[in-house]
Amino acid sequence: RELPNYQVFDERRYFVSGREAGLGPVVVDVLGWRVGLLVCEDAWFDEPALAAQSLGAQALVVINASPFHAGKRGEREARMGDRARSLGLPLVYAHLTGGQDEVVFDGASFAVDAHGAVAARAASFADETLQVTLLPGGAVQGAVAQPLSDEAEIWAALVCGVRDYVGKNGFPGAIIGLSGGIDSALVLAIAVDALGADKVRTVMMPSPYTADISW
């Protein structure tokens, strides 16, 4: 129903929104539940979810590829919690994990109950299957993974981005120039975590300011 077309998004180059195509919301029957299906931007606006509820949706499922930035997981859970609470419906949010060129997706799929509380969560930056059970009255049951610390989350994003960029492009590894400074040392540490030490080679490229200890 809604198409993002800003920043890294260019959806209108490839798609026409369901609204423009004259298509209504998608509500399907799954194991005795009427489930409203939202895609990406749909979940951030009121109308798509309200339209699904008007067709009898008892729960919402959101499929999404939402680019990572610091604090995004918390923003996402808060926004979807507000959506679920305003409608009185449980919501399950299935999210992409991995890197695609310069964009990184952090996973951490989750479910909130009809009161907007997080009731299930998958791990960040990990390929996982999150199993949730929808119960009468809008309750949700499932495992809740603990979120990463801010520092660990940033590190995981950097490692994920490098690993998938190298792997998806079919590169055999990486060669890194070291100056002796902390910046290139940090790049080396990220590369080793992402690819393994056997796939990383270094070349010392000192400057007049490189200290002897760097050797």
Cite the ranges covered by each PLM segment.
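ATP-dependent adenylate-handling ligase core
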Residues: 207-215
